[in-house]
């Protein structure tokens, strides 16, 4: 079995498939097609509530949204790979559990409509070789590509800032979820050969050139069932934000202009008012911010060993945060063993980390090209031991959303 799956990114070939799927479902050519990239977070995705930073890579796992205007005010949705269709209209635009993936597009329609934008009836077709259940930013890509398609089709005068507000209303008011700016920023602002660094304190992002040679980036869906072992919301309380705020110190020579206090006595004194579990996890938040800063610093210096150390340290941090699981830890331990000197923690040649919501499934690894085949063998061994059949994708940094 081949574990390194090839995603069709051939522009002309896949575009015809997208158009054909839309024609077959609705009997008309699409009026517009938008494409947005998948995404994974390298570090920092669990610290957004504390207004820290997240380092992300938009990747060439494209999601296509084709759309055509209707003569009425209804909305129809079709997901090609799921062979599933849904429908709604403005008067019944509500979150429905049974609508699953279609709720993402419905939320964007709500985001526009609730912002005073006038909508027309639209037929939508979603084409993605990676399903939303895998993670990897597919759901966000559906939302963002839908934004671009709706704006174009309905002739809406809607700035980029207004688009971000549409997405925020979609997430908070329709879906009832947090609005993670790093997700949207990666899908919108990314450029080839760059990472996206989101600063939640400044509500902004910047591009970080990413050009390590002779390396392959792999995303692995370990297919471990997600089991939530604790509620992250219990940590995301205003009083904890205030505590960590006391430990933020200005620093002119670091990204964002601040870092967390490193004096252990000071840290212990400030965190002495919380339980041991809460203290441990707040320390993980602080450590994760340092991992993000160290990753960016190493990338800018073209220092892969330092970058890899920071990534590996971030995964250990996620374990302390109670996000990882034995199956993913097993895979990443095998990655470390691919080094000729696996005990030399100062100069790793490969690295990897759990990514996403955690509690199972997503891993990214950045390997020497010569180690990709060996990693495939480890995945075969993983399947024999744990009984899960992983899927693995070779990816690279991709451009953000655009109309085709």
Where are these predicted regions, by residue range?
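A structural signal for short, well-ordered beta-strand segments
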Residues: 124-126, 220-222, 363
